[in-house]
Amino acid sequence: MDLKERILAYMHEEAYRPLPAEELADGMQLTPEDLVQFDAALEELEKEGAIIKNRSDLYGIPSRMHLVVGRLSMTAKGFGFIIPDVRDSEEETDVFVPGADLNTAMHGDRVVARVTPAQEEGRSREGEIIRILERANEKIVGTFESSKTFGFVTPDNTKLSQDIFVPKKAFHGAKTGSKVVVEITKWPDRRRNAEGKVIEVLGKVGDPGVDVLSVMRQYDLSETFPEDVQEAADNVEQEPSPEEYRGRRDRRDLPIVTVDGEDSKDLDDGVFARRNPDGSFFLGVYIADVSWYVRENQPLDREARERGTSVYLVDRVIPMLPKELSNGICSLNAGVDRLAMACEMQISPEGEVTSYEIVPTVIHVYRRLTYNIVNKVLVDKAEPYLSDNQDIREMSAT
């Protein structure tokens, strides 16, 4: 157990009461080596919001001091709710914060609030923000307006209710009606709004493509990948080798199909179904085995976790993984072998799953279908779609 963990464990003891740093160190009976690191450990824990130092310089656990640490979620109406990092019970609600008690905190900030219990059952607790631990909006996308001596940016995100003041020297080419990215240089206080400088002009509001660029900048979406991530993707072979088939169930003989949008390039799941002689059904669902290529805590894995998901915009896709994987070896393209994880099920005539297996497989997708083709076959019964897919009509009847 490291020093920070020991400090927290000591503070969570039932008999603990808030103490100054010196008495806390004495009570823990720290060694000389621990004492060298003690102040830094306290500072880190305080920055993390795991402990609180009050106005009397006493250290304690937030929940025992009627405080809550969490992330502020604002509404367009000017009030917000704190989503606690930790809930001591399921009954603990989010904390309602009136606009007058925000104390310059902005949407997404990690904050500490002094809390009063809910006045009525079923209502949220109410709080006043007393400290901002971490600012969330260092860069903001919005519309620029200028005057002779200064400008301001109205954020696109309606949860950011205050305009950002921009000194004339920080316009950097922005004009009234420009969509811009502004970087905060001074955080707001009780008497003034936040101040910033324009770091990128995306174009004029309403111009083609500016709306998409605005979304990309607002959510920090990048079409390119860090060098180590791209290098890892470039080193992945684009065809599986026979050695990789060992230990996998060979399903290359099944006429598995994928069903996706017309323009989809990352085809990550396929399906096959048939009726058994006794009237029951076999159903196989095959998902690209991305984990075979994206190893835990390696560059590809870390980047994928950071991105969280692929993002589909009007005119482009921002992939979670480089295209060498998302559109290549991890895409279940027709006519090539691919590694997949499968859930293979036996289903009764009444539609109940009677058994299933989750197994690694190697597959060979028979055909790429689209939602339009499936609709033409199953609903419209239209030619030439019926004839073109006669060989898999039995599956659709299943």
In which residue ranges do the predicted regions lie?
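Charge-lined substrate channels and their catalytic hotspots, especially those that engage the 3′ end
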Residues: 1-287, 291-336, 375, 396
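Conserved catalytic alpha/beta cores of large enzymes that bind or transform nucleotide phosphates
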Residues: 307-398
